[in-house]
Amino acid sequence: MKKLKVLGICASPRSKGNMEYILGRCLEAMRRNGGDEVEIKRYLFRAKKMNPCLDCGGCYLSGECVIRDDFQRLKELWLEADIVIYAVPVYHLGLPGQLKCFIDRLGQSICAAHSGECNGKEETMPKYLKVIAPLTLGVHQVSGQEQTIMQIINHALIMQCLPVSGDAWQCYTGAGGWTQNREEKDAIEKLAGEGDFSTMALIKAIETTALRALQLARVVREGLIACREELAGDAQYRFVLDKHCSD
């Protein structure tokens, strides 16, 4: 059985801080629950250059984004992954610009490269069926956490993937927390060390999100293997069938 590949993306441009901490807690839980079954990679936006989409149409001619920066490497990792964990700080009630640039260019370039393979000339996205989980953190209590989570969920749906959350009551649509107006880079780690109630609820949400993401990825893998003959004639499933069912 092939290993499940996990990609943890820290979308904060800051050096070692709160987002890296909560991503680390999630990946630790993934490792505890998955053991040798999972292969984990981590990607940090820190010191990376991610330019915005120019809507130039170049990717429709070559199948690749014409802008050369750190986008290409993250796109490769995203395509390889079975589970993508986005650890996202709240900026102005939503996604930070660097991550939005990646998401815009990912959708455009993948659609350009692969949509025609699915249904002739019609623009149809392949079924990537990656499990996508959002973790988010704001400085203030109600400062855009749910909106940021919904942006990631919408991204998952557009990319023909499966959004997942942890368990209620701590987690309905994704794991979201706040640093209680503290701006230190290690604020969440300190609050967790103090046993702060809302921070411990966030940690619980992160851990159950990791577990449910892993379980759903297993269901996807086993379901594809079980249904491969039925799905083989549908070009939209070609990518995931090649990924999970090839020798």
Question: What residues fall within each predicted segment?
Answer:
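N-terminal beta1-alpha1 ligand-phosphate binding loop
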Residues: L4-G35
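Glycine-rich phosphate/pyrophosphate-binding loop and the adjoining helix
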Residues: N33, V164-D247
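A generic structural motif
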Residues: G34-I40, C161
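Basic/polar N-terminal segments that are highly enriched at the extreme N-terminus
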Residues: M1-L4, D247
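Helix-loop-strand module that forms the ligand-binding subsite of alpha/beta enzymes
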Residues: S62, V66-Y172, Y237
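N-terminal beta-loop-helix "entrance" segment that forms/cooperates
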Residues: R42-E64
